[in-house]
Amino acid sequence: MFFGTFTPKLDDKGRLTLPAKFREELKDGLMVVKGQDHSLAIYPREEFLLRARKAAAASRSNPQARAFVRNLAASADEQDLDSQGRISVSAAHREYAGLKKECVVIGSVDFLEIWDAQAWEEYSAAHEADFAAGDDEAFANFL
């Protein structure tokens, strides 16, 4: 599971060092895909494949679901961590997420999110009231 907030820097070659505490769960490979709110999502390879198969099976008759699966699959970048725990973030993914040098990696329970630091700060500020107010549906299984 993935928890916490980290602030790695994107290097000049588009590589990002992932936090050491997450590397064991990603040692068998990972998938980088477009995420929600112009972030990137990183899933352990096997977790992603399970989810992708479920989504693909459910999407055959629903046009919105088919579009989601197509976009998800088209954005998927299968990778392995290098010896220093880095991934290469493609130019297309950097552009989609607006990544510059300063990044934020957050644990989102079963996957990671990569954000541009400024975008994460703005998103967090804009949604602080939502978190503080709580959401019975969102928190029903947690509280």
From Swiss-Prot:
Q: What's one GO BP annotation on this UniProt entry?
A: negative regulation of DNA-templated transcription initiation
Q: Which UniProt keywords apply?
A: Cytoplasm, DNA-binding, Repeat, Transcription, Transcription regulation
Where the record annotates domain SpoVT-AbrB, the positions are 5-47, 76-119
Please provide, alphabetically and separated by semicolons, the GO molecular function terms listed in this UniProt record: DNA-binding transcription factor activity; transcription cis-regulatory region binding
Determine if Transferase is one of this entry's keywords: no
Localization per Swiss-Prot or TrEMBL: Cytoplasm, Nucleoid
Which CDD domains has this protein been placed in? MraZ_C (cd16321), MraZ_N (cd16320)
**Protein name according to UniProt:** Transcriptional regulator MraZ
Upper classification of the organism: Bacteria, Bacillati, Actinomycetota, Actinomycetes, Mycobacteriales
Q: Which gene encodes it?
A: mraZ
